Amino acid sequence: MLDININETLGSFKLNVDTLIPTDGVTAIFGPSASGKSTLLNIIAGFSVPHKTHMNSISFNHQRWLKKNSAEPFYHLPIHQRRIAYVTQTACLFSHLTVEKNLQYAINRRLVASDINFNDICTRLKIHTLLDKLPDNLSGGEQQRVAIARALLSSPQLILFDEPLSALDENNREEILHHLEQLHQSFGIPFLYVTHNLEELMRLADHVLLLNNGQLIANQPIGDILSDLTLPLSQQQNSGVIIEGSVDLFDKQYQLLKLNLGNGQHLWISDANANEKPAHNIRIRVYAKDVSITLEAATQSSILNIIPVVISEISEVKNGQAIVKLNCDNHLLLSRITAKSIQQLGLVVGQSVFAQIKGIALLGAA
Amino acid sequence: MFLTPEDITAILLTLKLAAVSTAILLVIGLPLAWWLARTQNRIKPMIETLIALPLILPPTVIGFYLLIAFSPDNWFASHWQQWFGTSLAFSFSGLVIGSVIYSLPFVVQPMQSSYERIPKITLLTAASLGANKVDQFFSILLPMTKRSTIAAASLAFAHTMGEFGVVLMIGGNIPGETQVISMALYDHVESLAYDRAHVLALTLLAMSFFCLLIIYAIDRRGKSHGKSHGKNSHLRIRHAGH
């Protein structure tokens, strides 16, 4: 557990975060710009040191990183003793060292022995051909891959990411996202990931800290935070849910995965790249705008996925739009429909209806 | 017309003084410049002012105060005598102390602005990868500012070679101990030995010229290396008060 209690005043900006963050999987720190995300990350990293008289504390799995209370003097564990790695927007490679020496820099300063292997990391991040180059001669995406490799090779107990994709173009973003999805599963190193991008949040996060104007609004698992109609995420234009589950079978003829939702229900997910049934659980995203509601299951429809659900909550957004929360066994869906539809169909909480899902994105392994 | 043995002694002494002073200046000046580049301490302007003073003060003023500090009844000088068994006034050690103070701004100022141009996040990243402060200095800061460091060292070296006022006040004119080129030259002129003065003046001129040539050649190369950190385009040789 990362135990944080921060009460900082920086000019007119107040940052108040008192919470516990799980130290497995990916925890995203999410919020609009100037909500204090990076400030919080920098304090956790030790990059900015809070005022010595302010009451703050941070401990990581019972290792004290920062402490000040009325009984104890100020304590700040130096950055180099925290066993963290930090990946910024701009990669921040050491420009006087080749890629290989940048990676060696991390390996030479490990505080504990590790079986994270140089060649393995280079292969996974496809940087073998870059090793002799200087950072200035790399593209943005290449630099970021090297920065991530360097972070992993330092064998950290936590990796902090400060919007690592925001300086990249669309192709590079996609590639780095893919690497990040793979890496956090392979190494079991917790990630603390600052972003304001909902797409990145849905793809990577297991857990979310929601910040607004320096205040912690929510600290919940990704599934809960996306489907909580009282939180701003469900109200956004591209709101949606993610569903994780096991694959029952792979239909080779149509390139479809059959995702088990429990209780005899399933979803068909198109996967053009699959050759066989994946062994692991998968994560999918369903946008609220892609889910419509019918009172009876349409039998003659091009839509593959029509499943029985129960309405658990209805919230009117604005401009005649509404978000409806739907339960299917223990999975949740959101549906964005017009307020007029709700009135015409007479939708009420507790009603059994059918959800027609027009589009599902396969995000990767869960 | 050739250099006399006394002149050669003076040249060697000058080189020795410049070398020792430059070495000490790097040891003191680089950490000091790093501290100044990073600190937000309230005494920073005070320290910067003190370091810059030799740029505008006549060297004789510095020399005068050093002379007083070196007098045997002074606390500092008497302790020095106790620890090292030699007096500071009219000694090579005294000259080194004077040169270091006199040339300190020539190392600290360019290095401070060099260090200020290295993004803070670079060193923080090094720290997160496990580098402590000393490690950061040797593995990141020093290699990234290699050019500036060489230029600053050359400048300090050249500046120390040309020193006169401070030496005049605290060094006296003892051959082999404190008689540097500028003092020997002054002697020659005083005794109307213009031929010897010419040779010595020319030697100092040539040495200074090549020192500066090295600095500007480095500066030029630094500029052509567009992106690299620690380029020396800021280099300015200031007018000292002499």
Show which residues each predicted segment covers.
Chain A
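Conserved ABC ATPase "signature" region
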Residues: 63-66, 113-130, 181-182
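ABC ATPase NBD coupling module
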Residues: 64-85, 109
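Conserved ABC ATPase signature
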Residues: 134-138, 142
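A short, proline-enriched helix->beta-strand linker immediately N-terminal to the Walker B motif
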Residues: 153-157
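Catalytic Walker B motif of ABC-type/P-loop ATPase nucleotide-binding domains
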Residues: 159-163
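Internal alpha/beta loop-helix hairpins
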Residues: 181, 185, 195-265
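Glycine/charge-rich catalytic "coupling/switch" loops of P-loop NTPases
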Residues: 265-315, 332, 336-366
